[in-house]
């Protein structure tokens, strides 16, 4: 379909949104045409999520106009926007694990025969939606048994079952492998060809060129620009997003590790998961864990932290062998783990900034009767908000309302207050923007400069190469090589990650 022939599905004019004490959006413009992918880019806190919530009826604008196919509308709820053909696929997928694929696709809209659900029609209708996507998923399969990529396809099928002509996708590739991303992009191209308009939110700017037609950039809640994607470079997008040029993606290291071994493991084994894993971590070192998905990096970190059992091996910290049977044991010894799933494992998402900051060390903010001393409690929270430059209206703000980068900083603050000396960062920049990434990188460098040992688990090789001193490469549950970062490159890391490098000494 030629660009000129595409009809405008959505137009937002002069959209503003105010919350108590905060202007989240100010005079924002946006439009979406049929059969196009229109990306919305901006740092965390730029207003992307607020804009999407206005489109989908979660919020109503304080000012401005929304036109849907030329008609002025204002949706009072997501149910109203869904009924009008607007569907959103959230980064945290919104499915019920113990129900089947078909039941999830038609949840609360099941076809009925009298008072009973028409199971045959439910299954056939769900299969028709899945077939349209070209994916092989059994409609009777329970959602809890699906991969993240398959769950995403179920969400898209659910949108198709609503006859959605506007589809909002929030960080759709953040948890996908490269192969799964290729499949998703094929589905997106097919949806474009059928006339669906897609709003695409992602921090992975490099992959947008494959599917995005236009890009709108927001900064600090304000509209910056809209361009054809082919006419703009990734560097241009980043500069407009952050308001300055980011010539250096990684901070210059301010220190180098000592020769002292702070932490080491020997022969760590968990049967069927990883085997004979040994490595050392020097004082003030950033050690990278690289490898393909499923190589065992996260599993090793979780076992060291006591979250999963070990069948064999030795953990030595400051020259002393540790016995770790639970996360509490690891925390007491000064070992911290920042999970790749920060919302489920790293934060009490419905609690405040202050409560999350002190959660791992409540004894330090309690009086002699074991009751929380709220002055101490709040003083600690304020100290780490200032130290880590956490952007929040107050320490009483609920953490689920903050951006991903600020949530990650709160978790770091929690472990610093606990005086942890070995920190595992598992995919610490997943789903956060380029500006926030740089801030997290700077914090990691500053921790290393204080003599803390940092282990970075990342699927982004430029990140591993830009931050670390050495890199332990995993393949099928084993370390196949430990490489000096200054002397290696992506190609060599991938050889070891694929099992073709020489064995680590």
UniProtKB/Swiss-Prot annotation:
GO terms for molecular function: ABC-type D-ribose transporter activity; ATP binding; ATP hydrolysis activity. Keywords: ATP-binding, Cell inner membrane, Cell membrane, Membrane, Nucleotide-binding, Repeat, Sugar transport, Translocase, Transport. InterPro entries: AAA+_ATPase, ABC_carbohydrate_import_ATPase, ABC_transporter-like_ATP-bd, ABC_transporter-like_CS, P-loop_NTPase. It is an enzyme of class 7 (translocase). Its main location: membrane. It is a peripheral membrane protein. CDD domains: ABC_Carb_Monos_I, ABC_Carb_Monos_II. Its EC number is 7.5.2.11, 7.5.2.7. GO terms for cellular component: plasma membrane. It catalyses: D-ribose(out) + ATP + H2O = D-ribose(in) + ADP + phosphate + H(+); D-galactose(out) + ATP + H2O = D-galactose(in) + ADP + phosphate + H(+). Residues 10-245, 256-501 form the ABC transporter domain. It is found in: Cell inner membrane. ATP binds at residues 42-49. Belongs to the ABC transporter superfamily. Carbohydrate importer 2 (CUT2) (TC 3.A.1.2) family. PANTHER family: CARBOHYDRATE TRANSPORT ATP-BINDING PROTEIN MG119-RELATED, GALACTOFURANOSE TRANSPORTER ATP-BINDING PROTEIN YTFR. Part of an ABC transporter complex involved in carbohydrate import. Could be involved in ribose, galactose and/or methyl galactoside import. Responsible for energy coupling to the transport system. This is Putative ribose/galactose/methyl galactoside import ATP-binding protein 1. It comes from Agrobacterium fabrum (strain C58 / ATCC 33970).
């Amino acid at each position: 379909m030629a660009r000129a022939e595409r009809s405008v599905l959505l137009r937002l004019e002069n959209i503003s949104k105010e919350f108590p004490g905060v202007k989240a959006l100010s005079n924002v413009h946006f439009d979406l045409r049929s059969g196009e992918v229109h990306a919305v880019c901006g740092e965390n806190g730029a207003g992307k999520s607020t804009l999407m919530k206005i489109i989908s009826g979660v919020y109503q604008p304080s000012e401005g106009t929304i036109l849907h196919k030329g008609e002025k509308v204002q949706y009072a709820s997501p149910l109203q926007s869904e009924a009008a053909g607007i569907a959103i696929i959230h980064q945290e997928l919104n499915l019920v694990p113990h129900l089947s694929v078909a039941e999830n696709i038609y949840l609360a809209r099941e076809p009925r025969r009298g008072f009973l659900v028409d199971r045959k029609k439910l299954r056939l209708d769900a299969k028709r939606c899945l077939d349209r996507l070209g994916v092989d998923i059994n409609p009777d399969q329970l959602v809890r048994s699906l991969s993240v990529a398959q769950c995403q396809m179920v969400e898209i099928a659910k949108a198709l079952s609503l006859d959605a002509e506007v589809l909002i996708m929030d960080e759709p590739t953040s948890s996908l492998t490269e192969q799964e991303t290729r499949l998703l992009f094929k589905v997106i191209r097919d949806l474009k060809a059928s006339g669906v308009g897609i709003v695409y939110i992602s921090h992975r700017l490099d992959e947008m060129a494959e599917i995005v037609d236009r890009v709108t950039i927001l900064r600090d809640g304000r509209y910056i620009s809209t361009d054809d994607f082919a006419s703009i470079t990734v560097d241009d997008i980043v500069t407009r997003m952050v308001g300055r040029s980011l010539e250096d993606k990684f901070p210059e290291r301010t220190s180098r590790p000592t020769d002292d071994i702070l932490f080491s493991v020997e022969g760590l084994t968990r049967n069927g998961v990883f085997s004979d894993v040994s490595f050392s971590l020097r004082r003030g070192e950033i050690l990278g864990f690289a490898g393909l998905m499923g190589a065992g990096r996260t599993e090793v970190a979780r076992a060291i932290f006591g979250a999963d059992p070990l069948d064999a091996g030795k953990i030595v910290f400051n020259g002393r062998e540790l016995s770790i049977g639970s996360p509490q044991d690891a925390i007491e010894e000064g070992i911290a783990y920042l999970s790749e799933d920060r919302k489920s494992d790293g934060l009490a998402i419905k609690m405040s900034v202050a409560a999350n900051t002190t959660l791992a060390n409540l004894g330090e903010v309690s009086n002699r009767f074991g009751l929380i001393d709220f002055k101490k409690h709040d003083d600690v929270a304020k100290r780490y908000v200032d130290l880590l430059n956490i952007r929040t209206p107050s320490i009483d703000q609920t953490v689920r309302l903050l951006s991903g980068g600020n949530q990650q900083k709160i978790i770091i603050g929690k472990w610093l207050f606990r005086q942890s000396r070995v920190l595992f960062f598992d995919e610490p920049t997943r789903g956060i923007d380029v500006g926030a990434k740089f801030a997290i990188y700077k914090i990691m460098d500053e921790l290393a400069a204080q003599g803390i040992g940092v282990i970075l688990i990342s699927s982004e090789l430029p990140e591993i190469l830009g931050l670390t001193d050495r890199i332990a490469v995993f393949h099928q549950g084993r370390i196949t090589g430990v490489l000096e970062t200054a002397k290696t490159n992506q190609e060599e890391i991938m050889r070891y990650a694929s099992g073709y490098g020489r064995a680590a000494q």
